[in-house]
Amino acid sequence: MRETDLFEPAKKSVNVVLVGITVLCFFTMQVWEKSMTNGNFNGHTTQFLLEHGALYAPAIREGEWYRLLTHIFLHGDILHLGNNMLILFCLGNALEHYLGKISYVGIYFFSGILAGLGSVVYNTDNTVSVGASGAVFGIIGAMLWLVLRNKGKLKGFTGPRMLLFVFMSVYAGFTDRGIDNAAHIAGLIAGFLLAMVIYRRSEDETEVVS
């Protein structure tokens, strides 16, 4: 297999489906909000997100647990969506290749839900949070474990590159306001730990890459 193949979607890729559904949700809700408020297409208002599945601790304590899942498909604006989907498309295709569809989907949603719990526990009551970032950080954490498990040598990845990517991803969250770092870190840890449980290294996966 060529190294670049890892980043190309496989036939019937579940990762591509996840990206497609998330993008479709964003633009569908943009049209919906515009039809209700006569607003623009620059993004969603906080109130609209709150009313349609965003993370919000008081609501979850009142039994609206579905928000731990629905927030994954919501994004504040097109830049927020684009950043998450770009990383998901690139790393997700590779992780799906190594783990298979079922394990990949499990890590994605498990990490997203645990990221939501981390956000709710850490943040104040008035915090409204949305985005696939926690689930995406779970994918990053899982890929980190795969690279480490293969002694830093995996087709398409190396230990130093992956560690630098993780560091820069976490660091970026602390350089800007309005970033849910609790969700990012919780998702990263969840993905890493779940990958430790389910991943079994095969002999043909290790390969020195430049």
Predicted region positions:
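A detector for small-residue-rich transmembrane helices and their helix-helix packing motifs
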Residues: 1-210
